[in-house]
């Protein structure tokens, strides 16, 4: 049994970030292989996110001390509870490094544990922050669920279909995108821009969604909360925008889009450059002019060919990610 212990605080909700997508995908693949796996939450009861992931086993614990009785291997997600485990535990670090004030606490989280990061960039940053050798970290790269690679592409459209599917949070570059959409060239080039209203589980996402309610320069579409719907959306898009203004540890959405045959224009920052499957265009972050240029370059390249998509699908595969996880856990 491999138990992924969700961190204290929020429940595991679909459509709220890469940590959720990554964890759910790992559990599904482990189960497919006949390896028992589950998501464990503390203090949420049945409101722990299981509604969003009906195909994944959830175990709701009342107290953190109950983690000590979990059989098999415990994998803490992002933050660890201060409890002993039957076997050596692991911690997987999806998030960015926090402020220096949290260094001692984060060092305590990794004590006597297998430490996993989700990109080379992220691993380097965490090694520096935690003051540990980079060689101590195991890199278990993210992936695209196979459904993204098998999603049927929509027929070509006269207008280029541009999609922003990140959360409506400032760090995801939503304000950079809005500045781009107000540029005259974007209003006259005939592209069709859609913005997914994801990230409304927190106040800032709700605020930005309300602000965009009557926005004239893009179509607002509801968030997709499962891989099938997300794969369909990407397969009906030509260019995905990821104008992040902070150094993301990786960027699973970039990989998913490329597997779906969608070109990606993303900020050249953090782990995003590592997501290149052959359909990625990198641009300077916080620079609307650079983002417009990147969009123009991606559009000029045209729709991805069947060969380009097949080559993209050979990168960041789910089975390879789970193989790396099992090696890191010595299983």
Where are these regions (language model features)?
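Short alpha-helical donor nucleotide-sugar binding micro-motif in glycosyltransferases
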Residues: 232-237
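A charged, aromatic-enriched C-terminal amphipathic alpha-helix characteristic of glycosyltransferases
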Residues: 18, 60, 300-330
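A conserved mid-protein helix/loop that constitutes part of the nucleotide-sugar donor-binding site
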Residues: 21-25, 160, 169-183
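Nucleotide-activated donor-binding/catalytic signature segment of Leloir-type glycosyltransferases, i.e.
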Residues: 206-225
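Glycosyltransferase donor-sugar binding loop
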Residues: 41-45, 165, 192-206, 223
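Short hydrophobic beta-strand element within catalytic cores of glycosyltransferases
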Residues: 263-266
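Conserved acidic donor-binding segment of nucleotide-sugar-dependent glycosyltransferases
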Residues: 280-289, 296-302
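A short, active-site helix/loop in glycosyltransferases that binds the activated sugar's phosphate group
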Residues: 103-107, 112-136, 144-146
């Amino acid at each position: 049994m491999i138990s992924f212990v969700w961190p204290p605080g929020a429940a595991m909700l679909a459509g709220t970030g890469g940590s959720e997508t990554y964890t759910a995908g790992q559990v599904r693949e482990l189960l497919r292989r006949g390896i028992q796996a589950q998501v464990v939450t503390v203090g949420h009861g049945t409101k722990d996110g299981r509604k969003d992931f009906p195909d994944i086993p959830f175990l709701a614990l009342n107290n953190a001390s109950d983690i000590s009785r979990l059989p098999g291997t415990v994998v803490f997600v992002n933050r660890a509870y201060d409890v002993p485990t039957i076997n050596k535990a692991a911690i997987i670090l999806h998030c960015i490094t926090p402020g220096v004030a949290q260094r001692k606490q984060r060092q305590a989280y990794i004590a006597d544990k297998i430490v996993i990061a989700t990109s080379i960039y992220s691993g380097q940053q965490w090694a520096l922050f935690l003051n540990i050798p980079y060689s101590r970290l195991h890199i278990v790269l993210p992936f695209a669920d196979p459904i993204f690679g098998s999603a049927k592409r929509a027929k070509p459209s006269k207008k280029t279909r541009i999609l922003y599917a990140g959360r409506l949070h400032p760090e995801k570059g939503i304000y950079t995108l809005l500045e781009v959409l107000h540029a005259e060239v974007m209003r006259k080039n005939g592209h069709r821009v859609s913005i997914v209203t994801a990230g409304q589980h927190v106040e800032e996402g709700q605020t930005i969604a309300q602000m965009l309610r009557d926005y004239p320069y893009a179509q607002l579409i509801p968030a997709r909360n499962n891989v099938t719907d997300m794969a369909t959306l990407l397969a009906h898009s030509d260019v995905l925008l990821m104008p992040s203004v902070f150094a993301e540890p990786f960027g699973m959405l970039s990989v998913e889009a490329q597997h779906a045959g969608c070109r990606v224009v993303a900020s050249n920052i953090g782990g995003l450059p590592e997501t290149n499957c052959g359909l990625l265009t990198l641009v300077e972050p916080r620079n609307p002019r650079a983002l417009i240029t990147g969009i123009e370059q991606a559009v000029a390249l045209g729709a991805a060919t069947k060969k380009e998509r097949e080559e993209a699908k050979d990168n960041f595969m789910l089975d390879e990610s789970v193989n790396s996880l099992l090696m890191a856990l010595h299983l």
